[in-house]
Amino acid sequence: MIHILKGPFEKASRPLVDLLIRHHYTAFHLTMIAFFGTLLASILIYYQNWIIGSSLFMFFSLFDALDGSLARRNNSAKPIGAFFDSVMDRFSDSAILFAIIFYAFNTGKRNIFLLALLALIASLITSYIKAKAENFLEFGSIGLLQRPERVLIIFLMLLFPNYLLLGLWVLVIGGYITICQRLYSAYQKFNPQSFS
């Protein structure tokens, strides 16, 4: 859903991207800044510093969204860059959800612990399905909760921790719906090939 805003976001962020290019930042720099920023946010979340932690998480997630735009803007986009960015995104997603898992474990909140664990699995499997399918065919952006949607939900539930359980339910249900959507789409795309 949110991915349809990619074009307008890229256009609106162009002045900032140009500024970063003038100061010799590369897509790799932005990817690493976003990753370490998310690690910092995860530590703050673990210690229940919800407002600062969630704000930093969203800030660095938006920062991460600029790396592809910057690479395209200065004609430095390469497959290795997209690959590395995808890997670091998985580390970032895992870090923030692990922060919630450890917070729940230490505070004895079993429901939050279990749901955060299920949300982490859903996030990783969702990404894995696309990565694996794209080894064989063009897959595209498919599913109810892709990464931008997950980032927004995580930000909101961390900013308003009283709704943490609700946010995790949304992540879990939406995540497994997305897995089913991607599996079904992959089956449809693979099936004609199996009879060729």
Question: Predicted segment positions?
Answer:
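N-terminal membrane topogenic signal
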Residues: P8, H24-H29
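Ser/Thr-centric signal marking residues that sit
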Residues: F28-T31, T178
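Cytosolic juxtamembrane amphipathic/interface segments immediately preceding
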Residues: R14-T26
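Helix-loop junctions at the membrane-solvent interface of multi-pass transporters
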Residues: H24, L44-Q48, A99, L159-F160
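A feature for the membrane-embedded catalytic helix bundles of lipid/isoprenoid biosynthetic enzymes
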Residues: I2-V17, V87-S196
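Helix-capping/transition residues at the boundaries of transmembrane alpha-helices
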Residues: L20-R22, I45, A71-R72, E134, ...
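Membrane-interface alpha-helices at helix entry/exit sites of multi-pass transporters
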Residues: G81-S86
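Membrane-embedded alpha-helical segments that form the functional core of polytopic membrane enzymes
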Residues: T31-I80, R110-I121, Y163-G174
